[in-house]
Amino acid sequence: MTAQAVSPFAHLSDADVEQLGKEFDAIHQEVYNDLGERDRQYIRTVIKMQRQLAVAGRVLLLASKNKPAWAAGTACLALAKILENMEIGHNVLHGQWDWMNDPYIHSSTWDWDTASTAEAWKHSHNYIHHTFTNILGKDKDLGYEIMRIDPNQEWRPGYLLQPLYNLLLMAFFEWGVAVHDMDVEAIRAGEKPWADVWHDIKGISGKARDQIIKDYAGWPGISALATVALERITGKVRSANALRDSALGGFTGAMRANFTANIIRNVWAHSIIFCGHFPDQTYTFTEDEVKNETRGGWYLRQLVGAANITGGPLFHLISGNLGYQVEHHLYPDMPSSRYAEIAPRVRDICERYDLPYNAGPLSKQLGMVHRTIARLAFPGGRRKPKPGPYRGGLRPVKPTKRPGQLSGTAA
């Protein structure tokens, strides 16, 4: 039995949907007409700041035998990795900055500090996820093929372990993302040509090799050499055995720091991304429900299939502006720095058309996500109540009864 939710836009006529689509298109065009130097300065400043944090972290980790230096270096490195993946890499690969015609800050040339190849990410995320957002059986991000996060998904015994899968995915998120585009279900069904599978394997193995060498051999090796050089210069260590021990300490200290920074980045990215589509407020769809979908209908699906996270400017920066997940799904190619600017206009459209605007603090959204994952590990599950139309101040009214049905994310 499927869990059903009252459609949040069943009250809209075809003319309403068409007009709504035109209004959303107009916002996009107005922003693009206004892009200029302040936008260029923004992304270049963020990239510069990220590099400075990375350099500071690496320098501090040259003294990784010292605990305060190790902690500070690890923190700088973790923050640098978060910025690189969330606000820079993800958004550059969306083509948000292609309008600059900068050969370096461009979706066709950018590579990022994570295990996933840019090519695989652009296919699984930019194309599959953003095209088929929240469509059951089409959007592979709904549970990442290992978890049941919607009561409309058929239960299988393997889902009993999904709370454990979730913890492992949280810690090693970059590796889960790296293999995501493999499309395991298509391979099992024999629908994916082996030439494509082999191409994916080569891409994953090559990127994995580079990441492992960089984080767990290259930088630790540099730290070990720097430790030995410093102690030789200062004359603190004279014997060969002592130098060897110092080198080993520098190597392992840097390696532990890189591992810790990667885990911190993975947990943060997992938390922000899962809060984008899995909280109670969001809707899922069947393929039949989106047949003959118009441009306005696409906007509506993106609007109610996503959920925002409220927070201040610093939070939005380190979350890659994915606290504005609604705006990001409406305009994935718009510079992320503009989402806060257009959010009031999106809310205004929601209010005028009696549509929900999904948002909540991180603690609330994340709590709902983990509760849903735990509950739907078992058979059954019913949808949670959905918010009603937006009515200013991020306070939706109570749901109203309307005809029409849509699938509902629930626990």
Which residues does each predicted region cover?
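A beta-strand-loop signature enriched in Asp, Gly, Thr, and Trp
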Residues: 281-292
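Non-transmembrane, extramembrane segments of multi-pass ion/lipid transporters
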Residues: 27-34, 184-195, 284
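Low-complexity, highly charged intrinsically disordered N-terminal segments
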Residues: 1-56
